[in-house]
Amino acid sequence: KFNCDCITDLCKRMNIDFDTYSIDKSFRPIFNKELNAGEWFYLINYYGQISNTEIEVYKGKYKNIIVDNAQAYFQMPVEGTDTLYTCRKFFGVSDGAILYTDKKLNRKLDIDESFNRMRFVLGRFERSASEFYI
């Protein structure tokens, strides 16, 4: 069972039931369970070792999958497959992630401007330059 605590901790906090799986020496999951309705297979792409062709095979077998490409930032997502990426493992940022999905969000999100937290860096990008003269 080789996964980041942040995954299991979040599932526990959100009261999401989960099972873990082992991996083989090629970092492929050892998982032969049939998924029930409403269950998802969380496929961790360790070190980018699983190709998109292999991901398509998992998608065909399990239908509902989420691909964790946190360690494969530069691997394109498989079309129609929910895929997560992290920024902080590859770039000098404290946090941040990207979700690729074709699902539609049925709620309105608040618009956030980052310049109040990063005025010296982003202010001139998001507003006029004159607002940030010292």
Language model feature labels by segment:
Residues K1-Y73:
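PLP-dependent aminotransferase-like
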Residues F74-I134:
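Active-site region of PLP-dependent enzymes
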